[in-house]
Amino acid sequence: MQTTTINQDTKWVLDPTHSEVYFKVKHLMISTVTGQFKKFTGSVETDGDDFSTAKIQFAANVDSISTNNEQRDAHLKNGDFFDADNHPRLIFDGDKLEKIDDEEYALYGTLTIRGTSKRVKLNVQFGGLTNDPWGNTRAGFSVSGKIDRDDYGVSFGAVTETGGLLLGNEVKVFAEVQFVKQEVLEEVA
């Protein structure tokens, strides 16, 4: 006798109009410059509403980087930094979301910048689930973490006259994101 079970896979699509992705890096080691990626996509696949089973895909368009300074943005896009012509996207593939408590998670995955992929751990705060006025279920998350830009070949290393670094190597990354639920039923024999 053959049995058929129905697994409910849920896809969540990132809502870019209610999300932002940004970073902070030390400048001259005395102040912080903030930048953001204005164009990005993302999705999450879960087993129902259980985010501990999440598989996450995210990509940011490097050409959309903005620090509110056109000259600096152009420099960030060139070969000294992100090399947008050869590496147009920054990619994150999350493969493990470890629940710490009801609101806190540790997210593990692979971050690819300039063609270099490294494992990273990010901190995630679950903001909750809610229904919007149009009948959609939404999930909100705050994501934060730190990476070393040298690990990804983003190693522009100008030094000041006094021997100090022009830019810090540690980059703090942040995302405030909303995902919209889209259910897909999959039949497994």
Residue ranges and their predicted role:
Residues 1-189:
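Low-complexity, acidic/polar, glycine-enriched regions of mature
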